[in-house]
Amino acid sequence: MSRRICSVAALFVLPALAIAQEPLPFLHAKDMIVFQGDSITDGGRQRTGSDYNHIMGQDYAYILAAEIGAESPERNLTFINRGISGEGVPQLTARWQRDTLALHPALLSILVGINDLPSAAPTRETAADYEAAYGKLLAETVAALPATKIVLGEPFMLPVGRFKANYAADMVELKKRQEIVDRLGARYHLPVIHYQKLFDAACSRAPADHWSWDGIHPTYAGHGLMAKEWLRVVDQQWGSR
């Protein structure tokens, strides 16, 4: 009898726990969350919007949309992925009005920078170019969307595949961009997700190729790691999980 009473009591306790642990409690019903960036965010997403199995891609953004959507269905939040493979800040800027500002998201997540390295950018842009362009983009965004919460993701790299041979040299340039993201976060009072530190620490638990299959694109385990850290940082900044 006592076991049965405990089981019945649990039915009333569990929903209360679920409500207390609701992710992103600062968001309201029908709010929109937009993910912007390059191929890491793109995740091979389907473009037309007719295939809802693949509309978010296969990445950290998908994991977050799945978890938050399942844990908080009552709010009917909308998740939109606008990441495009191969893009850097100049390409984001060209489509920013259509793919970001016009959407008026409640929460905007940006991860860009790996394609802004001299070895990747066709224009061979410098760190100063990256800072000026990214800073201008954020200034325009903050002015146009004063109520939108913005989180910045730090670009990252691991010594895997073709990035292994020149890893030290590439990291010199990448670190400049990582420091720029930190400065821009401080300037506009935006939280920054330090993915490089996250992956460096994870490499003490498993080899780098467990987390990234080519040095810049995460494996499913890497995307899972990113999603957990994203949620931790965002909830720490604006709410509690």
Regions picked out by a protein language model, each given a short descriptive name:
Residues 15-16, 50, 206, 231:
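Hydrophobic alpha-helical membrane context
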Residues 18-19, 33, 220:
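Intrinsic low-complexity/disordered segments
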Residues 3, 27, 59, 63-78, ...:
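Alpha-helical cap/lid subdomain in secreted, periplasmic
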Residues 84:
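Conserved active-site regions of diverse hydrolases
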Residues 1-9:
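Bacterial N-terminal signal peptides that target proteins for export
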Residues 23-54:
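Short glycine-rich His-centered loop
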Residues 11-19:
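Hydrophobic h-region of N-terminal signal peptides that target proteins for export
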